[in-house]
Amino acid sequence: MSLFTIGDLHLCLGAPDKTMSVFTGWQNYQERLEKNWLENVTEDDTIVLAGDISWGMSLQQAAPDFHFIEKLPGQKIILKGNHDYWWTTLKKMEGFLADEGCSSIKILHNNHYQYGDYGICGTRGWVNMPGEVQDEKVLRREVQRLETSIQSAVKAGLEPIVFMHYPPIFATNFNYDILEILYRYKIKDCYYGHVHGRSAHELCVTNTYDDVNFHLIAGDYLQFIPQKVI
């Protein structure tokens, strides 16, 4: 039994015009993902999908992508990315997944999931650069969601592992509000996606910074091979 993760699947079975195959490093990405998933992940495993899961604009349009994920082995825990336009209220999403028979997909949102002695925690996050007032409102909300998730794991006596969509650090841009939460709760590992392309990957923190181990898990960076966490 193992824990895996990968971000940015960008599935488009319900919106084929949104395929990422036109970009360098993304050729046949859905087929490669399926092959690598089947070779590495078993039914006894859990895998965290760190946002940008489907290009569907609604739950209905994203349904083929959920069914694709459902058929793959393992328990799946999903969190929101900036391109998950289908995302709606937790009640609606859980009801939709239940109606579609997607029983292996769980949603990480203001909560945690236990994995052994660990708590799987996380949220989408937000951009690192100073923005408009609206950006500040979104950032404050994301900071609260991250802390709520981590606190729920700590209260359960678990060691939190954090998964996010946006990177807390990118190039010379630091999201100090997010980092403060990671430092306060002494988070050892933070996994994130969002960043695409070799030149951008080179600007990411992929080592230990201020006692936090940062891991880039964007699909193209991992060559669509799920990364083992535990």
Explain the meaning of each model-derived region.
Residues 81, 91-99, 125-133, 194-213:
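Short secondary-structure transition/capping segments
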Residues 2, 15-115, 176-186, 210-218:
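Core catalytic region of metal-dependent phosphoesterases/phosphodiesterases
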Residues 7-11, 51-54, 82-84, 111, ...:
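Active-site metal-binding loops of divalent metal-dependent hydrolases
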Residues 77, 168-230:
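Conserved beta-sheet core of the metallophosphoesterase superfamily
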Residues 9-14, 40, 88-174, 181:
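Conserved catalytic scaffold of divalent metal-dependent phosphoesterases
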Residues 3, 46, 118-119, 159-161, ...:
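Structural motif
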Residues 1-3, 229-230:
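Short, Lys/Arg-enriched, disordered terminal segments
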